[in-house]
């Protein structure tokens, strides 16, 4: 008798979408709904690639079911995936769902999604734009860690918790907006080297990991020392006495004008940057940031 190797399938059904792309699903919730999954147990025989449009519902064997979840490792290491459309029927994005999808440049997470699990978009190194829907309540640990092309993040006011290392290693990240709804910020959540503006809309600040927490700092030392922390009007004294937040060298009330700036402690000496936050030895033609204020040189 000759034994032939067999592939163990990790899916319940595979159905072509309208673009002719096979998408694989598992039955969930007693078979009433579908979850997007991968093809095989080794995650490597079939790879999603190009543009993938996930449908809101799938009809199979004369029965129609909603697609409500993107399962754990569904698009794991699909480096050829360039775009994905997530429908409004999806409520959760599982662990490592898009881990190391290095060709993915942007993603829109619809308002129907309530949770983004751990490592969901970790190391998507080409990801420059993320739109997080207003239904998301939790962003898991390392969810966007090492997304090195991501430059800014606005977290919607539906989010209550941001996990450990959620945006750590995002070396291109220059600005972060944290809504008042957030009640928990994990260790090293925004540990990125280039953050120049932090906008906190939290009206009653609570302790976060500060400069003394060597391995757990919510932000790195450069951010604490050089970035500007913008806080709601009337709250600056609270921030200056709250653990972690008080470590910011530059705290101002109100919001910036939409420009990313950097300020450091050099007394009255002029500190000059261009609009991209690059430090200049002298003003150049056009708009310059000098000691945190915009000036025009003709």
Q: At which residue positions do the language-model features occur?
A:
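Structural signature of tandem-repeat unit edges
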Residues: 29-34, 46-69, 79-92, 102-115, ...
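Bacterial Sec-dependent N-terminal signal peptides
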Residues: 1-12
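C-terminal tail/sorting-segment detector
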Residues: 287-298
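Residue-level detector of functionally pivotal "anchor" positions at catalytic/ligand-binding pockets or at interdomain
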Residues: 254-276
């Amino acid at each position: 008798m000759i034994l032939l190797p067999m592939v163990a399938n990790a899916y319940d059904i595979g159905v072509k979408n309208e673009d002719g792309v096979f998408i694989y699903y598992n039955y969930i919730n007693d078979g009433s709904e579908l979850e997007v999954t991968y093809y095989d147990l080794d995650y490597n025989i079939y790879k999603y690639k190009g543009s993938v449009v996930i449908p809101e519902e799938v009809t199979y064997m004369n029965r129609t079911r909603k697609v409500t979840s993107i399962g754990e490792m569904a698009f794991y290491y699909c480096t050829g995936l360039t775009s994905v459309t997530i429908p409004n029927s999806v409520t959760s994005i599982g662990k490592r769902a898009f881990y190391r999808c290095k060709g993915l440049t942007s993603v829109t997470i619809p308002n129907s999604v309530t949770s983004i699990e751990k490592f969901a978009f970790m190391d998507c190194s080409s990801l420059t734009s993320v739109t997080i829907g207003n239904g998301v309540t939790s962003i898991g640990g390392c969810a966007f860690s090492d997304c090195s092309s991501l430059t800014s993040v606005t977290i919607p006011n539906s989010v209550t918790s941001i996990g450990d290392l959620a945006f750590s290693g995002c070396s291109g990240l220059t600005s972060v907006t944290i809504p008042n709804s957030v009640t928990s910020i994990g260790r090293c959540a925004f540990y990125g080297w280039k953050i120049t503006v932090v906008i906190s809309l939290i009206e009653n600040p609570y302790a976060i990991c500060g400069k003394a927490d060597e391995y757990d700092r919510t932000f790195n030392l450069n951010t604490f020392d050089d970035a500007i922390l913008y806080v709601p009007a009337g709250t600056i004294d609270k921030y200056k006495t709250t653990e972690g937040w008080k470590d910011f060298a530059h705290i101002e009330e109100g919001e910036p004008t939409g420009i990313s700036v950097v300020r450091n402690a050099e007394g009255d000496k002029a500190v000059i940057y261009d609009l991209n936050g690059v430090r200049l030895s002298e003003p150049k033609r056009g708009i310059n940031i000098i000691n945190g204020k915009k000036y025009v040189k003709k």
